[in-house]
């Protein structure tokens, strides 16, 4: 790590901006093999589905071949000879692209560490569990009672190879690396395997996921620079504890660097976004923008985003990918949570001299609920219960040992409780727990060819109850409310950091 920092660290004499020579250094591939860089396995260096099965011997031979070859020998006429540098094209191209992604991540990682160090909460560097999904926690904790409209945005997907290259041209200075990037994209480009838009998220090819994830994250990072305009005149964009999460810190770091440039070049458009009181969050290819503004203002934002993305990225972006919903009339379905703003009526009796008055007040309250009907539908699809919520046995698990069966049911139960720990109402979770517990008992009774009552009487009902309620030592976050002293004691919701992705049962769409 120190050697890389010395190479990239600018000095008074010269500044090293060229990443291309690092491709020919063998220690780079060794670092990529064990996810090195000694920065606590940062999220930028760990991607789900990343294939870390590197062979250092193959890398050594590959580097030797790269030194010996004058140019890439690619056969386009004979499709049967799938060769790359005279050898297996798929294997070597994957090795080089993975190494390339690792190298280009280095300046991003160093910049991220420096931005994290500028905040007071430096303890974040000691956590191994932070993921981009955790940036949604403070969004769900924000005060939405004063907001009116919500924009549901599906981030546009790149339709041209050069768009992906241009997103990196500000960060990668040497043309050789950009040409190598173009080479990889032309090799792997396939609309069905690289990036597709059939779902709100994006799917990547099974191979080279690290390479494609890095390109996509860089592209989305560039798309989010659009919100510089929307935030410029607002003092309410930054959410509760905004300095506590990686993605938010990086997002605001980019805003601070670009706000002066954009404000100077495009002063005409800034008047549209005077004090918008907005909140923003993104996960995967879906983002949400909530604001206090009127419908006319939100509609202007919608067409502004469409026009900006069309002009800046040279793509055809349809207005149907952005939907405007009124927050008080629609429930938000985001990441398996059912969020809504409901009116909480309260009656206050006031007495003035001999007359008394009864005043009815309706206070808006933002709730994050557990969607019981879709969740039961997901359990029924996995054969844990019927569509009406009646628990049934799991026949495919009957061949497992008793401890494995209990462990699987207990893991599902704990994962759901951790995933929905931030829900404002947890009564639904206890119904889910009842379904899983009884389904586990029926599966065990089916295995031992007895009834549920007989099995529980013989083994003891405390066995299931004790296991399903056991907790593990998991890092968690809480966001205390600043107004808790005014409204009494606020019961902080707990957000667990062992959540890496949307729960499969919660992802019922």
Curated annotation (Swiss-Prot):
PANTHER family: MATURASE K (PTHR34811:SF1). This is Maturase K. It comes from Atropa belladonna (Belladonna). One of its GO terms (molecular function) is RNA binding. The keyword Glycoprotein does not apply. Pfam families: Intron_maturas2, MatK_N. Keywords: Chloroplast, mRNA processing, Plastid, RNA-binding, tRNA processing. Usually encoded in the trnK tRNA gene intron. Probably assists in splicing its own and other chloroplast group II introns. It comes from the Eukaryota. InterPro entries: Domain_X, Maturase_MatK, Maturase_MatK_N. Belongs to the intron maturase 2 family. MatK subfamily. It is found in: Plastid, Chloroplast. GO terms for cellular component: chloroplast. One of its GO terms (biological process) is RNA splicing. Signal peptide: none annotated.
């Amino acid at each position: 790590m120190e050697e890389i920092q010395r190479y990239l660290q600018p000095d008074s004499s010269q500044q090293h901006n060229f990443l291309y020579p690092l491709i020919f250094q063998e220690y780079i591939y060794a670092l990529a093999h064990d996810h090195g860089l000694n920065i606590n396995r940062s999220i930028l260096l760990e991607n789900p589905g990343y294939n870390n099965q590197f062979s250092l011997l193959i890398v050594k031979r590959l580097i030797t071949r790269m030194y010996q070859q004058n140019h890439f020998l690619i056969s386009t006429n004979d499709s049967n000879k799938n060769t790359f540098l005279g050898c297996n094209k798929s294997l070597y191209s994957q090795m080089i692209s993975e190494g390339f992604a690792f190298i280009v991540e280095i300046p991003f990682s160093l910049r991220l560490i420096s931005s994290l160090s500028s905040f007071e909460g430096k303890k974040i560097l000691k956590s191994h569990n932070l993921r981009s999904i955790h940036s949604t926690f403070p969004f769900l904790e924000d005060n939405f009672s004063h907001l009116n409209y919500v924009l549901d945005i599906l981030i546009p997907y790149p339709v041209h190879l050069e768009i992906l290259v241009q997103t990196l041209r500000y960060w990668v200075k040497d043309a050789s690396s950009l040409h190598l990037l173009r080479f990889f994209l032309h090799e792997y480009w396939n609309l069905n395997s690289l990036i597709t838009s059939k779902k709100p998220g994006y799917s990547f090819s099974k191979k080279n996921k690290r390479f494609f994830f890095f390109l996509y994250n860089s592209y989305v990072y560039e798309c989010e620079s659009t919100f510089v305009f929307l935030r410029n005149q607002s003092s309410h964009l930054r959410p509760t504890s905004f300095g506590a999460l990686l993605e938010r810190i990086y997002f605001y770091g980019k805003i601070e660097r670009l706000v002066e440039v954009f404000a100077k070049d495009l002063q005409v458009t800034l008047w549209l976004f005077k004090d918008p009181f907005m909140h923003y969050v993104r996960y995967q290819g879906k983002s949400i923008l909530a604001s206090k503004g009127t419908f006319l203002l939100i509609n202007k934002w919608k067409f502004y985003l469409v026009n900006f993305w069309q002009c800046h990225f040279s793509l055809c972006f349809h207005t149907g990918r952005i939907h405007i919903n009124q927050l008080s009339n629609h429930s938000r379905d985001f990441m398996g949570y059912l969020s809504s703003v409901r009116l909480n009526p309260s009656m206050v009796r006031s007495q003035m001299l001999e007359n008394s008055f009864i005043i009815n007040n309706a206070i808006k309250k933002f709730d994050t609920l557990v969607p019981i009907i879709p969740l039961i539908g997901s359990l029924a699809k996995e054969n844990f219960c019927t569509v009406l919520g009646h628990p049934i046995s799991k026949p495919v698990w009957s061949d497992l040992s008793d401890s494995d069966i209990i462990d699987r049911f207990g893991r599902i139960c704990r994962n759901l409780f951790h995933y929905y720990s931030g829900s404002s109402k947890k009564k639904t979770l206890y119904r889910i727990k009842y379904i899983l517990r009884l389904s586990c008992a029926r599966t065990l009774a089916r295995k031992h060819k007895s009834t549920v009552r007989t099995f529980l009487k013989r083994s003891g009902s405390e066995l299931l109850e004790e296991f399903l309620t056991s907790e593990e030592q998991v890092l968690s976050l809480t966001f205390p409310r600043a107004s808790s002293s005014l409204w009494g004691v606020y019961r902080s919701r707990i957000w667990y950091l062992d959540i890496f992705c949307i729960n499969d049962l919660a992802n019922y769409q």
